[in-house]
Amino acid sequence: MSENTRKVTVAVIGSGNIGTDLMIKVIRHSEVLQMGAMVGIDPDSDGLARARRLGVPTTSDGVQGLLQLPNFDEIDVIFDATSAKAHEANAALLEPLGKRLIDLTPAALGPFVVPAVNLDEHRDAANVNMVTCGGQATIPIVAAVSRVTPVAYAEIVASIASKSAGPGTRANIDEFTETTSHAIETVGGARRGKAIIILNPADPPLIMRDTVLCLISAPDPATHDAIRDSIQTMVDHVATYVPGYRLKQQVQITPVPDGQPVRTLLASGDAATPTHQVSVFLEVEGAAHYLPAYAGNLDIMTSAAVRYAESVADTIAAPTAAQGATR
């Protein structure tokens, strides 16, 4: 963003863990975004209390309260960190008013965005969906494999600390699996995808860990080397906006044992005969801006959402900059 371009003003709906972490990231770390409002429904929530202390306009009356704020017209982008059902109602109110929505729920009303894979594909969309924490962590790996060879089936298992799962996450478990599975196919490129989430009750809490399994039909070692290189490049890319994202161990590519009924996992009508399984083990440590370091699942969502908002900031702010140049 140039020096003459104004900062893009954002609002956050949802004053829980994700919403509060978004606010902290915008205030402390973004050079192109600025907070315009924090919206909640619990006047005693920690998120609203922190926002007030930081001088951010607040309302505990939900989206209706946001509409009544004196600076509502100045807000360009709205992050929705509520729930899938709540987002449907919020979008119905806000989209007609010309606000850009970044949806951090599994509602998936708009196109999926995973910054490391398709950051520039939906820059003009009125409402984009950030998939899920498991999707943000694992879909880049599926895409990295797909760029080298077709993926007949991809399965991801996201294990997160139970303490990091708030009411919104717990209420959306079914939507999590459905949305992530769909995005594994549409963004990751797998012909069939499956997602599993595990809430790990261990105490002290463990950081987010993800397993990605891909079935491929590629027996040659050269392709295997290319897959490993593609995955490492992708991990490095994601780590530019989620520094705690890393491989837990080396990528494993193993032959599918004879007689293994892997074809039962494939999409209906898929004639592929998988020869190898690619196994990738990841961990995601949070940046601890607001959330504990073990909550990498929440940190990767907020980091991805901010990354997308910053990527479209020039487009949103450009008209004002152009007007200023003509004065």
UniProtKB/Swiss-Prot annotation:
SMART domains: Semialdhyde_dh (SM00859). It catalyses: acetaldehyde + NAD(+) + CoA = acetyl-CoA + NADH + H(+). NAD(+) binds at residues 15-18, 164-172, 297. It holds the Pfam family Semialdhyde_dh. Transmembrane segments: none annotated. It is an enzyme of class 1 (oxidoreductase). It comes from the Bacteria. The active site is at residue 133. This is Acetaldehyde dehydrogenase 5.
